[in-house]
């Protein structure tokens, strides 16, 4: 292969690789190249066959379209070369593509069978015969597989298919109201539906009807897909037209502004000078206009024009102020000059010595951090933070400006404690101890959020008369006092509730020493009737101890509420800070039943003191076993 042939083949291959969609311009270009360079026919054939073998299944059909166009428009020797391997290419492609592409391949093959101008088929007869036999076997096999995959036809199933086809046809008829074929199709479908309802057809007849309905349904789907593609192409064309119109408008605006500038320069050139010859002034104006408007390469947007106007105003104002001596110019070795040099300011050029020094200097962000740390360190110099009168909490210091806070202590606050809690805003330092405190603080937030959000179903219970109305929510109930008393607030320390080091944590149920073991052991069996009576009926038990008993709400409880069998009052769950659990306060559990501990205590006392003690105990047993 010589150099010219190699260049042509490379061009052909590069164009062929762009054929990833059904593009008529690309196929036409390939056909023209094949027609103009018949000496390279074998290379072109090899390239197309390689493209069909290696490209994606979705793109194989487009390469076949290029093959078809070249053979129909150019003819020999391409038809001879392609006939050698046509059957294998067609067979492999047919087995890989989907049913829609297979239908298009079959339609293309039917066109190959039609005789051309010489009265012969497009390709050799042996290759076309092999393809025809293959398609017969493949269609028969496909028909069998399709029939095997289809469900057993029944009248209700076919009626549903007819309804689907009717809907599709009606949608098409809305867009094409004058189409007589669609109207006839709707009429045939309605008649077929009536016949299926009237007569009892055999299974074979039902299968034939099913296959015909499937074919019609696939055709309608194909038509709808093509219509959707057509609409998408129209939308793309509209977008392109809009973009072109916008570009044209911008170009028109540009030409209008250019014409205005040109007319202005012409008028200024044609003006009669008051003194002397105007040749020098015209030359200066021409050079000025050419320098200002001669190198415009594109159209500027309105925002850019406004930005330039504002920058010009600022520059003019700065120049006028500097000319009046109202702007302080820092000396050459000042920190401002050094800062601008390090940042690469355009007004400050660096010599070789300064560039070498700049390499040894740290980065600007690090220098800013060092400067801020120095400000924070010297912020409290000569300031007694605890005894300063300007820092005392009073109305005067709050309403008036406080220079010590604004100029000194703010630097100390944000530099000495740079790490801020994203939830509450509390600040922490960079030391290891401060980081540990921050982690404990975040753990405390996690525990609080877990309590607030919760994962159990809770209930807001409302009682009207004797009816119990419950509404299930996903947010736990918060039972706590909003404000502390003065003495509690003075003695309050954040670390006691935010730290995880303290043993007296909320999740430790054994921290409460005032509650006896019978209150903590909520799941203990109290089957022994005598032990319950001795515990609750003891003379040494007082009312506070009885009311202090509680039961952890079981996981099986959905509404977190129960009704006391004795007083018929509804008890709802509250969150216990000390145990970290949802509990029913003033409650005991007896044989799987829950009672108010005070109600149970009073009932047991009354039954023991009564003359008919056995009857009272029997009544209590009934309450327990209900």
Curated annotation (Swiss-Prot):
InterPro entries: CID_dom, ENTH_VHS, PCF11-like, Pcf11_C, Pcf11_CID, Pcf11_Clp1-ID, Pfc11_Rna14/15-ID. Component of the CFIA complex, which is composed of RNA14, RNA15, PCF11 and CLP1. Interacts with RNA14, RNA15 and RTT103. Interacts directly with the phosphorylated CTD domain of RPB1/RNA polymerase II. Changing residue 66 to D: Loss of interaction with RBP1 CTD. Pfam families: CID, Pcf11_C, Pfc11_Clp1_ID, Pfc11_Rna14-15-ID. Residues 1-130 are annotated as: Interaction with RBP1 CTD (CID). The lineage of its organism: Eukaryota, Fungi, Dikarya, Ascomycota, Saccharomycotina. Residues 4-139 form the CID domain. Residues 263-286 are annotated as: Disordered. The gene is PCF11. Disulfide bonds: none annotated. It is found in: Nucleus. SUPFAM superfamilies: ENTH/VHS domain. One of its GO terms (molecular function) is RNA polymerase II complex binding. GO terms for cellular component: cytoplasm; cytosol; mRNA cleavage factor complex; nucleus. Gene3D superfamilies: 1.25.40.90. This is Protein PCF11. It comes from Saccharomyces cerevisiae (strain ATCC 204508 / S288c) (Baker's yeast). Keywords: mRNA processing, Nucleus, RNA-binding, Transcription, Transcription regulation, Transcription termination. One of its GO terms (biological process) is mRNA 3'-end processing. Component of the cleavage factor IA (CFIA) complex, which is involved in the endonucleolytic cleavage during polyadenylation-dependent pre-mRNA 3'-end formation and cooperates with cleavage factor NAB4/CFIB and the cleavage and polyadenylation factor (CPF) complex. Independently involved in RNA polymerase II transcript termination. Binds RNA. Seems to bridge RNA polymerase II and the native transcript and may be involved in dismantling the RNA polymerase II elongation complex. Present with 2800 molecules/cell in log phase SD medium.
């Amino acid at each position: 292969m010589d150099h010219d042939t190699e260049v042509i083949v490379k061009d052909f291959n590069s164009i062929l690789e762009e054929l990833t969609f059904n593009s008529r311009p690309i196929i036409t270009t390939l056909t023209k190249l094949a027609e103009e360079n018949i000496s390279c026919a074998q290379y072109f054939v090899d390239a197309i066959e390689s493209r069909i073998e290696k490209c994606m299944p979705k793109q194989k059909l487009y390469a076949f379209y290029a093959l078809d166009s070249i053979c129909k428009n150019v003819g020999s020797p391409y038809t001879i070369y392609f006939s050698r391997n046509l059957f294998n290419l067609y067979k492999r492609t047919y087995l890989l593509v989907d049913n829609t592409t297979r239908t298009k391949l079959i339609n293309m093959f039917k066109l190959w069978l039609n005789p051309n101008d010489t009265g012969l088929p497009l390709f050799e007869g042996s290759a076309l015969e092999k393809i025809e036999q293959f398609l017969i076997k493949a269609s028969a096999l496909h028909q069998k597989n399709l029939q095997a995959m289809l469900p057993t036809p029944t009248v209700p199933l076919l009626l549903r298919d007819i309804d689907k086809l009717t809907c599709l046809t009606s949608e098409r008829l809305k867009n094409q109201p004058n189409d007589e074929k669609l109207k006839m199709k709707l009429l045939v479908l309605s008649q077929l539906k009536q016949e299926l309802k009237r007569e009892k057809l055999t299974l074979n007849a039902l299968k034939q009807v099913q296959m015909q309905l499937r074919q019609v349904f696939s055709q309608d789907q194909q038509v709808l897909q093509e219509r959707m593609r057509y609409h998408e192409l129209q939308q793309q064309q509209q977008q392109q037209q809009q973009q072109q119109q916008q570009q044209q408008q911008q170009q028109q605006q540009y030409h209008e502004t250019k014409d205005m500038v040109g007319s202005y320069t012409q008028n200024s050139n044609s003006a009669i000078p008051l003194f002397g010859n105007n040749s020098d002034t015209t030359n200066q104006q021409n050079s000025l206009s050419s320098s200002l408007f001669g190198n415009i390469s594109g159209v500027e947007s309105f925002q850019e024009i406004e930005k330039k106007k504002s920058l010009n105003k600022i520059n003019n104002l700065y120049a006028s102020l500097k000319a009046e001596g109202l702007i302080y110019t820092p000396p050459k070795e000042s920190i401002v000059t050094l800062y601008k040099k390090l940042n690469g300011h355009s007004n400050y050029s660096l010599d070789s010595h300064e560039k070498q020094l700049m390499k040894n200097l740290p980065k600007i962000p690090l220098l800013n951090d060092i400067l801020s740390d120095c400000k924070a360190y010297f912020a409290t110099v000569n300031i007694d933070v605890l005894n300063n009168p300007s820092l005392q909490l009073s109305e005067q210091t709050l309403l008036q400006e406080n220079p010590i806070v604004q100029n000194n202590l703010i630097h100390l606050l944000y530099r000495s404690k740079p790490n801020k809690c994203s939830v509450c805003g509390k600040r922490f330092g960079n030391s290891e101890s401060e980081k540990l405190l921050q982690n404990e603080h975040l753990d405390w937030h996690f525990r609080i959020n877990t309590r607030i959000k919760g994962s159990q179903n809770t209930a807001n219970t409302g009682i009207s008369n004797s009816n119990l109305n419950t509404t299930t929510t996903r947010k736990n109930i918060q039972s706590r006092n909003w404000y502390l008393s003065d003495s509690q607030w003075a003695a309050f320390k954040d670390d006691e509730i935010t730290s995880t080091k303290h043993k007296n944590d909320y999740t430790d149920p054994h921290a409460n020493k005032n509650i006896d073991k019978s209150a903590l052991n909520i799941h203990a069996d109290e089957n022994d009737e005598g032990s319950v009576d001795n515990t609750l009926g003891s003379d040494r038990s007082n009312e506070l101890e009885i009311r202090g008993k509680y039961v952890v709400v079981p996981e099986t409880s959905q509404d977190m509420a129960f009704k006391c069998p004795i007083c018929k009052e509804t008890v709802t769950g509250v969150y216990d800070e000390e145990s970290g659990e949802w509990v029913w306060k003033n409650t005991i559990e007896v044989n799987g039943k829950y009672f108010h501990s005070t109600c149970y205590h009073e009932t047991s006392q009354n039954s023991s003191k009564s003359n008919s003690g056995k009857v009272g105990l029997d009544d209590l047993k009934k309450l327990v076993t209900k």
